[in-house]
């Protein structure tokens, strides 16, 4: 059975994550206040940032950067986006 959370990104009741995305208070906060949709969108953004900026996720500085960008993304604040990325156009005929 899915659970519902009031998503801080979308300011709406939405389907929540099945479990915290990682241990600790921050993981629990995300579990309690971020929808599954918002989390999936963040993972996509995170992947683009890692690839575009050639981040080594084992580097503490890169981890701090991604943590900060994640918090900004999930709180609807300005965050760094992958440079040059243009979302694909949706074809209305499909």
UniProtKB/Swiss-Prot annotation:
Q: Which domain of life is it from?
A: Bacteria
Alphabetically ordered keywords of this record: Iron
List the GO biological process terms. Answer: cellular response to oxidative stress
Q: Which GO terms describe its cellular component?
A: cytosol
Q: Which residues form a coiled coil?
A: none
| GO MF, one example | iron ion binding
Family membership, please give it.
Belongs to the Fe(2+)-trafficking protein family.
* Function recorded in the entry: Could be a mediator in iron transactions between iron acquisition and iron-requiring processes, such as synthesis and/or repair of Fe-S clusters in biosynthetic enzymes.
Name of the protein in question: Probable Fe(2+)-trafficking protein
Provide the taxonomic classification.
Bacteria, Pseudomonadati, Pseudomonadota, Gammaproteobacteria, Oceanospirillales
């Amino acid at each position: 059975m899915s659970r519902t959370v009031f998503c801080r990104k979308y300011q709406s009741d939405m389907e929540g994550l099945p479990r915290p995305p990682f241990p600790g208070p921050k993981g629990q906060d995300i579990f309690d206040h971020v929808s599954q949709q918002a989390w999936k969108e963040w993972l996509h953004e995170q992947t683009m940032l890692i690839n575009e900026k050639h981040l080594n996720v084992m580097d503490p500085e890169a981890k701090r950067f991604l943590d900060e960008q994640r918090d900004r993304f999930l709180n609807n604040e300005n965050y760094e986006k992958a440079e040059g990325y243009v979302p694909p156009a949706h074809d209305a005929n499909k």
